From Swiss-Prot:
One of its GO terms (molecular function) is single-stranded DNA binding. This is Puff II/9-2 protein. The keyword Glycoprotein applies. The DNA puff II/9 proteins have a proposed intermolecular coiled coil structure with possibly intermolecular disulfide bridges formed by numerous cysteine residues in position D of the heptad repeat. Glycans are attached at residue 156. GO terms for cellular component: nucleus; Smc5-Smc6 complex. PANTHER family: STRUCTURAL MAINTENANCE OF CHROMOSOMES PROTEIN 5. SUPFAM superfamilies: Tropomyosin.
Length: 286
């Protein structure tokens, strides 16, 4: 009966070792009868053998329990690591959403800046056209001024010649006056010559007055032209200052936009390079 109990314990140990599969001793099994037929020495030998097997099984069971404990600890560690990775993934997703939102805002700002730049380019082109027109008008005014100066110079030369001629006529008149006493006999001829000289003098005087009037008129025109030229120079200087300021502002805006775009691009590239954006379910980039 004791041998039967030992055998039952051994079978139960084997059952636990095999993963809980049910092993029972049937009432109709002939093992009991076989054990009853064995001698006492044979039963002792078999019991010793069973005890050895039982010890071996206990060692195996202890080893499996240790491995089970190790696996359980590893499982707990993996669970904790999984929780940490889940939290990290959640934070990374939130950071990525913020980065994408910032990128969209930056792109929108970039588009606005591009529109502003295009508008400024159009205004700059119009300003350059206006500047070219002002330069052309200034050049035309300078040419007209040069023509007027040349004409004034020519008129001055003509006046000088007429004045010299007038002086000669006056000298001749004086000579005639001096010779008048001596030339009483030639009085009629001298009077005619005198009348002719006076007439010529009057014509020259009228001509000189007309020339003086024309010179004065030309001087007034020249003064008006100089005034317009100075006004045009002032307007050109103000326009150049405004154009230079706008060009400087445009250059500053372009450089700042390029700097911000480069910084955001570098930040986005650094973010992608320093963070694992792989999505676990699809094994692709998030």
């Amino acid at each position: 009966m004791k041998q039967f109990i030992v055998l039952t314990v051994v079978l139960l140990a084997i059952q636990e070792l095999q993963g809980g599969s049910v092993v029972t001793v049937d009432d109709k099994c002939t093992c009991k009868d076989t054990l009853n037929t064995l001698t006492k020495g044979q039963l002792i030998d078999r019991l010793v053998l069973c005890n050895q097997r039982n010890d071996n099984l206990e060692k195996i069971i202890d080893g499996l329990k240790k491995e089970n404990n190790i696996l359980r600890k590893e499982n707990d560690g993996l669970r904790a690591e999984n929780c940490q990775l889940s939290e990290a993934l959640k934070r990374e997703k939130e950071a990525r959403q913020k980065a994408e939102k910032a990128l969209k805002e930056c792109q929108k700002n970039t588009e606005n800046l591009k529109e502003t730049i295009e508008q400024l380019k159009k205004e700059l082109a119009e300003a350059q056209k206006a500047l070219e027109k002002c330069k052309k008008e200034l050049a035309d005014c300078k040419k007209e001024n040069a023509k007027l100066l040349n004409k004034i110079e020519e008129l001055n030369c003509t006046i000088t010649q007429l004045q010299e001629k007038l002086e000669r006529c006056r000298g001749r008149e004086r000579d005639l006056q001096c010779q008048l006493d001596e030339c009483k006999k030639k009085l009629n001829i001298c009077n005619n010559e005198l009348i002719a000289c006076r007439k010529q003098q009057e014509e020259l005087r009228c001509k000189i007055e007309r020339l003086n009037t024309e010179i004065e008129k030309l001087r007034k025109q020249n003064a008006a032209c100089e005034k317009d030229l100075n006004t045009l120079r002032c307007e050109t200087s103000e326009f150049l200052a405004i154009a230079t300021q706008r060009q400087s502002q445009l250059t500053s805006i372009i450089q700042r936009a390029e700097g911000e775009s480069s910084a955001i691009k570098a930040s986005y590239i650094g973010f992608r390079n320093s963070h694992d954006l792989t999505c676990a379910p699809c094994a692709g980039p998030a």
